[in-house]
């Protein structure tokens, strides 16, 4: 009889696609500062759009406005990828101020719910009549 190991199920943190609409400021350990754009965001990390890539494993401090809050956090940059007009570089959060992570999670959830509601309304308004007499 085969030994069955218990399988672990990992639930990914909800993430929101921002598509570069949220600007962010980052500061490297050496004090250099850059303005970047957020493309994806979750409570564990996200994806930045940069003009030039930054070395993998660089530690940064970042700040950005999201929803009704200003987020200040520490992060570590991951391997950059060539994209569109510059580079896309994933990051993972390594530290938040007190209560920031929970508030960020609430803001992301709120925004996802708003997007789902808007998409549902759009689908209902785009629905064409099933039968000719329904349109009359």
Short names for language-model regions:
Residues 1-41, 105, 109-136:
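N-terminal helix initiation/capping motif
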Residues 6, 58-61, 74-76:
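Short structured motifs
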Residues 17-23, 53-56, 88-108:
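Short solvent-exposed strand/turn elements
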Residues 22-57, 61, 90:
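Short strand-loop-strand
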Residues 36-37, 73-79:
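Short beta-strand-centered aromatic/proline hotspots
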Residues 43, 80-85:
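Short, conserved beta-turn/loop elements at beta-strand boundaries and strand-helix junctions
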Residues 65-69:
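Short, charged beta-turn/beta-strand-edge "cap" motif at the junction between a beta-strand
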């Amino acid at each position: 009889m085969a030994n069955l190991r218990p399988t672990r199920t990992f639930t990914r943190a909800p993430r929101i696609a921002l598509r570069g609409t949220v600007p962010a400021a980052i500061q490297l350990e050496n004090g250099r500062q850059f303005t970047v754009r957020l493309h994806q965001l979750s409570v564990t990390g996200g994806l930045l759009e940069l003009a030039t890539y930054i070395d993998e494993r660089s530690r940064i401090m970042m700040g950005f406005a999201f929803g009704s809050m200003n987020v200040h956090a520490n992060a570590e940059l991951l391997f950059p990828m060539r994209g569109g007009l510059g580079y896309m570089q994933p990051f993972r959060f390594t530290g938040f101020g007190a209560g920031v992570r929970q508030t960020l999670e609430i803001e992301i959830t709120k925004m996802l719910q708003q997007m789902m509601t808007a998409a549902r309304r759009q689908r209902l308004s785009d629905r064409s009549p099933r039968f000719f007499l329904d349109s009359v």
